[in-house]
């Protein structure tokens, strides 16, 4: 008999794999990956062709801690989206592939996407 928590985490892994199996980022169109934990939000631009992270922002960054962006809410998520868009623009990235991972496109994940779109990224 399997534990219900084990089944829950196993389903989460399978959801993430199902989403990511069709997404591939390149140097011209990197993958915008959003991860949320119980306390923090992490956003990364990833080039899958070379396996490198091009840029990242999170609520753990010192600049965000100094400006008070340490809580996990929708306003902070939108700000992180605009920050990653600004960094992407400085790297000459206009288009991205949005990777929501195992999370629904709702709430914090949707606000990160809206902030990135307002910042100028297209997906």
Swiss-Prot record:
Keywords: Ribonucleoprotein, Ribosomal protein, RNA-binding, rRNA-binding. One of its GO terms (molecular function) is 5S rRNA binding. It comes from the Bacteria. One of its GO terms (cellular component) is cytosolic large ribosomal subunit. One of its GO terms (biological process) is translation. SUPFAM superfamilies: Translational machinery components. The keyword Protein biosynthesis does not apply. This is one of the proteins that bind and probably mediate the attachment of the 5S RNA into the large ribosomal subunit, where it forms part of the central protuberance. Belongs to the universal ribosomal protein uL18 family. Part of the 50S ribosomal subunit; part of the 5S rRNA/L5/L18/L25 subcomplex. Contacts the 5S and 23S rRNAs. This is Large ribosomal subunit protein uL18. It comes from Chlamydia caviae (strain ATCC VR-813 / DSM 19441 / 03DC25 / GPIC). The lineage of its organism: Bacteria, Pseudomonadati, Chlamydiota, Chlamydiia, Chlamydiales.
């Amino acid at each position: 008999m399997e534990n219900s928590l084990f089944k829950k985490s196993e389903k989460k892994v399978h959801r993430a794999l199902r989403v990511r199996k069709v997404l591939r980022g390149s140097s011209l169109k990197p993958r915008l990956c959003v991860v949320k934990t119980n306390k923090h939000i992490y956003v990364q631009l990833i080039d899958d062709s070379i396996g490198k992270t091009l840029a990242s922002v999170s609520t753990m960054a010192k600049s965000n801690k100094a400006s008070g962006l340490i809580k996990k809410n929708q306003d902070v998520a939108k700000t992180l989206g605009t920050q990653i868009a600004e960094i992407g623009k400085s790297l000459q990235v206009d288009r991205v592939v949005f990777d929501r991972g195992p999370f629904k496109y709702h709430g914090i994940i949707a606000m990160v996407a809206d902030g990135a779109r307002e910042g100028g990224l297209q997906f």
